[in-house]
């Protein structure tokens, strides 16, 4: 079995969640499968093994799980990017586009130092609004965003292309055509 099929087979698809017409790609089944989880993290880390990566930034909430594992393997620090109002210390924030409206994310102002090399991690990229906001937030405080990594890309929704337009290399382990 190929890597792509192996990982795809551990992702559960839930139709009509959170609303009719949506196919929700659920990675909790991948996370529960020790072999698949390990393999996915190894593949996310592989291009940067031996490179100088200072921090891994994970987008709330599944990006925390994956980002922590990636940071551990790269011997890098981990930085949570959270919804506004969830961090206790002084923060820097960025608004980002949602399918219907906007939201705001933030991180601690001292979590990344100017010039530090950062990899952004989340479970899935769809329209790219959240990831684009995270890249802009990291750049706002002077980080060099080396890449953005995801388990899943939904290429028909254009998010990866949006990040590439910002000169951010994108690594996704699998893709699901359609929504």
From Swiss-Prot:
Keyword field contains Glycosyltransferase: yes
GO biological process, one term: purine ribonucleoside salvage
Record keywords, A-Z: Cytoplasm, Glycosyltransferase, Purine salvage, Transferase
One GO cellular component term: cytoplasm
Catalytic activity field: AMP + diphosphate = 5-phospho-alpha-D-ribose 1-diphosphate + adenine
Signal peptide: none
A Pfam family: Pribosyltran
CDD domains: PRTases_typeI (cd06223)
Record pathway: Purine metabolism; AMP biosynthesis via salvage pathway; AMP from adenine: step 1/1
Major location (coarse): cytoplasm
This enzyme's EC code(s): 2.4.2.7
Function: Catalyzes a salvage reaction resulting in the formation of AMP, that is energically less costly than de novo synthesis.
Assembly with partners or alone: Homodimer.
Family from the record: Belongs to the purine/pyrimidine phosphoribosyltransferase family.
UniProt-recorded name of the protein: Adenine phosphoribosyltransferase
